[in-house]
Amino acid sequence: MALAVWSERVLELLLKMNNLQHAGCLPFCVQGQRVGWVTQPVAQVLLQSSDIFTLYKEDSGARLELSDRLRTPHQRTRAVQEVMEALRGRGAFPCLQEWSDELYDVKTFFSDPPLLSVERAATPLLGVSRRTVNVNGFLRRGSKIFMWIARRSLTKPNYPGMLDHLAAGGISAGSGVWETVLKECEEEACIPESLASKARPAGTVSYAYEKDDALYLECEFVFDLEVPESFQPHPGDGEVQEFYLWPLDKVRDAIVTQEFEPNCALAVLDFLIRNGHIQPDE
């Protein structure tokens, strides 16, 4: 792929994944703490659907607040879950059709205790940050680096059949970062813990975009895992069809196509930059 074309497509990817404008969005608060953002159309539906949401208007601006009568994380989780299940049944928002039966913790800061937990598919409606782990699996052949790429199962509710990391997944409620790394490596690619434990933290990649009145905010904890030449990943939990071992030139071209899952493409782009495969002028 010509450099000029590739650079233009990278810019398109970055703009697509970072198009969130807070103007017009309402802070979503729990116990007086802002934990997310809600668009006006979503706020209107939530207010009409349940009295657990209240709109407050003050001189400093408006906000959407979860009811204070829900005093515990369990009560908040159950109440919000009931609302989201009802909205899903009505076909109210496209994101709810990706229902996963997986809860994500909602916190003010990552190190804080959770205020509640929310179904993964519903997090964009409340604009709460999702946190994931993304594992770059790679090996070296002389001076060249090759990367393991997964193709997602066609039965996945989101991004079916698209290209992905060797292993990646959301940090579900009650789970930790390292725990999730080991879990996703074993479940998605049958990587034994003896090898997965060699993954090294490489930083974080964050993005925020708006789609269909929903706000997608995510922080990816990125890990690099160098594997031996003899290593061969295998699909484990049915979320992956197959794996490919590609040179970085091919990976570089793939991440700017419609075939690559865009949020994972960002973490791979980060890997390419950190390993000197993309130069500053590119």
Where are these regions (language model features)?
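N-terminal leader/linker segments that precede catalytic domains of diphosphate-processing enzymes
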Residues: M1-M162, G170-E186, I191-V240, L248-F260, ...
